[in-house]
């Protein structure tokens, strides 16, 4: 995980396009590169 909470929020609060794997804003509804609407939240590491 990131050292600072601000850095962690900036790198992990994203959506990933299922088609081209581009990073998109969290509030995006479609991909900025290919226009595909299948976005998923970026996976986060589980804390134990």
Swiss-Prot record:
SUPFAM superfamilies: Zn-binding ribosomal proteins
Keywords associated with the record: Ribonucleoprotein, Ribosomal protein
Xref: Pfam families: Ribosomal_L40e
MF terms (GO), sorted A to Z: structural constituent of ribosome
GO terms of biological process kind: translation
Record-level GO cellular component terms: ribonucleoprotein complex; ribosome
Keyword Ribonucleoprotein found: yes
Family matches, as NCBIfam families: PRK04136.1
Family: Belongs to the eukaryotic ribosomal protein eL40 family.
UniProt cross-references to HAMAP family, sorted A to Z: Ribosomal_eL40
Protein's recorded name: Large ribosomal subunit protein eL40
Biological classification of the source: Archaea, Methanobacteriati, Methanobacteriota, Stenosarchaea group, Methanomicrobia
